């Protein structure tokens, strides 16, 4: 095992999808002497990357966000970590149908092709297990897909190492930082200190905690996103991959339903705000699943269960389809909702 260096041009703290991406792109830009550290094990150090649902809808009213998303999808495809399955945003109200036509307009404006407004019957053709009588229609976008984020991160990290630009170290926790004249000069860890010209904090829901060590602030708040996986679903019995059927996005209820192998994943953003401080997130050793997978609070999901039963009753209402996995997953959110 390589010894932790005492000096580096740049220390990247964090080995989730963001930290690995930064490491890879710095290496591609010609940077050398990069050191990446994470307090968890690899390839899944225990952050949000390991449990995120990882689907991408490419359309946004913001031109900048749409273009960033398009470039991200391009890179994931190049890595071989993107599965295109299509997706349908459904509408329960006339107002939502109007919004979906606006999204089509934005898609065309930003050069995103292939999307179309679909009737309830057409939604049923695309997603046979949906209850078409409770929707007025939808917006079908065939280029929606799912990313294998752990594999993508692993490949990016490995490519940076193969370029001779980087070293990566797992199970090393940052304990402090030395700051001089407003710049981080030294990263202190359990296994020694690293002097660095540059330091990148890419630790997701722990970022605010590490920023404090540097006498600064990163406006990220650990917040719960509830999700559960139910199955096995008879309709998915012959599935060969992770996903073959379009993802359902229901913005009227702030929920989604997506196939996950032989199961159905149901996620919600409609529950009450459940917020934490970074200091409340347990260590890898103390966590039952992973540090960012908190125990599921069913009472916060009761209404969402009703919504999912209404939309996909043939699956959610099947007594033989049981809950396989459910978490209060921790994501990091900003005050402006980005």
Which residues make up each language-model segment?
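Glycine-rich FAD pyrophosphate-binding loop
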Residues: 27-49
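Dinucleotide-binding Rossmann-like beta1-alpha1 core, especially the glycine-rich loop
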Residues: 52-126, 252-257, 261-265, 292
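Central helical "cap/lid" subdomain
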Residues: 189-246
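Helical element adjacent to the flavin cofactor pocket in flavoenzyme catalytic cores
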Residues: 139-198, 202
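Short beta-strand to alpha-helix junction loop
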Residues: 67-70, 89-99, 139-161, 169, ...
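Beta1/beta-strand and adjacent pyrophosphate-binding region of the FAD-binding site
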Residues: 3-18, 35
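Glycine-rich Rossmann-fold phosphate-binding loop(s) that bind the pyrophosphate
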Residues: 15-20, 39, 203
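Active-site lid/adjacent beta-loop-alpha segment flanking the redox-cofactor pocket in flavoenzymes
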Residues: 86, 217, 233-337
């Amino acid at each position: 095992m390589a010894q932790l260096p005492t000096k580096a041009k740049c220390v990247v703290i964090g080995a989730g999808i963001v930290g690995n991406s930064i490491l890879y792109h710095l290496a591609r830009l010609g940077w050398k002497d990069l050191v990446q550290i994470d307090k968890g094990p690899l390839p899944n150090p225990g952050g949000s990357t390991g449990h995120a649902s990882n689907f991408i809808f490419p359309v946004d009213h913001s031109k900048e966000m749409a273009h960033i998303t398009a470039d991200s999808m391009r890179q994931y495809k190049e890595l071989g970590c993107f599965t295109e399955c299509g997706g349908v945003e459904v509408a329960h109200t006339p107002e939502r149908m109007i919004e979906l036509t606006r999204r089509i307009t934005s898609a065309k404006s930003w050069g995103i092709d292939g999307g179309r407004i679909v009737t309830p019957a057409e939604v049923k053709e695309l997603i046979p297990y949906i209850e078409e009588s409770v929707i007025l229609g939808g917006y079908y976008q065939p280029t929606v897909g799912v990313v294998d984020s752990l594999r993508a991160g692993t490949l990016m990290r490995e490519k940076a190492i193969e370029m001779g630009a980087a070293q990566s170290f797992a199970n090393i926790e940052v304990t402090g930082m030395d700051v001089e004249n407003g710049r981080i000069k030294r990263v202190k860890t359990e296994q020694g200190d690293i002097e660095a010209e540059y330091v990148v904090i890419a630790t997701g829901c722990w970022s605010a905690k590490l920023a404090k060590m540097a006498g600064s602030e990163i406006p990220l708040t650990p917040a719960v996103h509830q999700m559960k996986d139910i199955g096995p679903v008879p309709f998915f019995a012959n599935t060969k991959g992770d996903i073959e059927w379009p993802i359902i996005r229901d913005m009227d209820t702030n929920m989604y339903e997506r196939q996950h192998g032989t199961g159905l994943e149901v996620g919600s953003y409609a529950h009450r705000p459940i917020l934490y401080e970074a200091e409340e997130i347990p260590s890898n050793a103390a966590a039952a699943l992973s540090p960012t997978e908190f125990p599921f609070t069913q009472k916060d999901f009761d209404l969402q269960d009703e919504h999912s039963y209404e939309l996909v009753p043939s699956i959610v209402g099947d007594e033989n389809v049981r809950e396989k996995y459910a978490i209060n997953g921790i994501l990091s959110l900003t005050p402006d909702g980005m």
